[in-house]
Amino acid sequence: MLETNKNHATAWQGFKNGRWNRHVDVREFIQLNYTLYEGNDSFLAGPTEATSKLWEQVMQLSKEERERGGMWDMDTKVASTITSHDAGYLDKDLETIVGVQTEKPFKRSMQPFGGIRMAKAACEAYGYELDEETEKIFTDYRKTHNQGVFDAYSREMLNCRKAGVITGLPDAYGRGRIIGDYRRVALYGVDFLMEEKMHDFNTMSTEMSEDVIRLREELSEQYRALKELKELGQKYGFDLSRPAENFKEAVQWLYLAYLAAIKEQNGAAMSLGRTSTFLDIYAERDLKAGVITESEVQEIIDHFIMKLRIVKFARTPDYNELFSGDPTWVTESIGGVGIDGRPLVTKNSFRFLHSLDNLGPAPEPNLTVLWSVRLPDNFKTYCAKMSIKTSSIQYENDDIMRESYGDDYGIACCVSAMTIGKQMQFFGARANLAKTLLYAINGGKDEKSGAQVGPNFEGINSEVLEYDEVFKKFDQMMDWLAGVYINSLNVIHYMHDKYSYERIEMALHDTEIVRTMATGIAGLSVAADSLSAIKYAQVKPIRNEEGLVVDFEIEGDFPKYGNNDDRVDDIAVDLVERFMTKLRSHKTYRDSEHTMSVLTITSNVVYGKKTGNTPDGRKAGEPFAPGANPMHGRDQKGALSSLSSVAKIPYDCCKDGISNTFSIVPKSLGKEPEDQNRNLTSMLDGYAMQCGHHLNINVFNRETLIDAMEHPEEYPQLTIRVSGYAVNFIKLTREQQLDVISRTFHESM
């Protein structure tokens, strides 16, 4: 138990007390103090003059950034740390929430700890030159994560990486997907948190095993990072040592804690957590005391959201191929239901979504509604209304996640749930199941290069592919792949902890935490449809002069995933369960728990490039379907049948998430807005009751996207949902835009 002081008494005045006063327990604080809101959106306030002026400035900077080839400015000398840069502002006189990553908004930081080669490549991609002294330091004197990984990789791992049977690995970029509990800084102040870490350090085991030594060093780094966080606050004129005393301070304290994380790390997903209900407690207290108005509350939220929209990292061209459109995954989880049955919806839940009106649509922050059939009807209707209007919201099934994670979890990146401040993950990208099937047919040889990448066993020699024979070899190939995959991830995360440790994010966790090893699969629908074709049609392999199977001839029809047909849907379910079982047989770094996702981001295009012709009729180089989606155009029985197929994928085997991106034309939801809202709400309820996990919802016509592709200057804020995140459509590459346009747009329910 830690001692509190008069600062805490002042900051906590009017709050209901509990264990949270003596120990870090943000969840209990929320449960004791939040105010459920079941009303409608009529209380919401429009943008203030300051908000409109600031957003005009952001839009002008965004325009200049596009005109400069995607990079407004970049630091090429100073390695980014929590305290590396002076304070920066958009307009100090107008901003209610302040802080940017460098001394100027839109100037991107240089983050070499993950890999100096990547930092250099990011500079050169935009016409900048990395400072010679900085390059020398991180080449000759300070080893990086990337160098450590490649020092330890085996030849087999390198071959799999090059061929693309495992790809997107976080060995050349920050792993991300760790959510610091940034709320702790607002509630307790940094001094309280430092005392807690020192207490843990002084009371832990002194039996110096390797695990104990590592944890003691990590705690020392966490303590140091918290001290630097106070210095960051001082740069902006704030005393973060004490807890926040009002709503504005609570938002500012929380944001500066998040800012420290994104100054120190450039992880693929730097998610925010679950902040709206927590912050609403402060807003309600100030509103009741008459010290703030609703318009002022909304202005502070809008300025906070504005800061989250301009989070930026310098990325390499290879990274941008995998994760297109400059995403940062500042994921904020909104809503959900408590384990006591009370919805966690507050007025702030509305205010966060209302920023899409006040500032216009945007991909960041990645607004994620934790959907439950028990959410208040007015909130459900408002969510549907904003989805139809902006296509900027994703939905995740709180009713199935709450069973595993309780009621204070957040979403990291796209679809990965974790209990805030008590759990982190080792992000693991994806294994390519479609390509693995081709390896089974070709005896471990790569269908594109002819190289022996997989184990060297006899391939399929028959003139017609026979299901049992193919599946037996496929099963053996998945055994091999699971081992190489887990071992690769063990190397990556050992080195990331060693050379690019997330000090401030982990300082905002409990000392003892749950770790997961978050694997993933790509090409699920391609593999399932391919096996269905082999089983129900006649598939003849076509070989080249070396005897390598390079194409297929299909005679007859076959069931296709996405039409609520158990004959093929059961194949998809079996593949997920089977591969997860194989992964679990391998030991993980730090005894992390195995999890898996069915998620591709926009890398479905890259996976397609890496994969040859497949037995389902997909041609070499064609993109895979994103995430757990059916292949483009194959879900022909309407929206509900498509959703039903995806909902069969078992969440118990895919606790890292099952991504489904769903596009529907407005008229199919109804003629009148009220009908559209009601039908979309009913569809979400039905999907949740079927145990579907995740749904990106796009509501627009294909013609809109085609026009935006031809006239991007007219669509600066056109936002679409892709696999697990949102993106400005005009920031996608032409190839990725065409991929999105080619996907199924449901014209009937």
Swiss-Prot record:
Domain PFL span(s) in chain numbering:
3-619
Residues in a coiled coil are none
Quote the pathway field. Fermentation; pyruvate fermentation; formate from pyruvate: step 1/1
**Residues at the active site:** C413, C414
In what way is its activity controlled? Activated by pfl-activating enzyme under anaerobic conditions via generation of an organic free radical. Exposure of activated pfl to oxygen results in a cleavage at the glycine residue harboring its organic radical with loss of the 25 C-terminal amino acids.
Keyword Transferase assigned:
yes
Which residue intervals define the domain Glycine radical in the entry?
Answer: 626-749
Function, as annotated: Catalyzes the conversion of pyruvate to formate and acetyl-CoA.
Protein's name according to its UniProt entry? Formate acetyltransferase
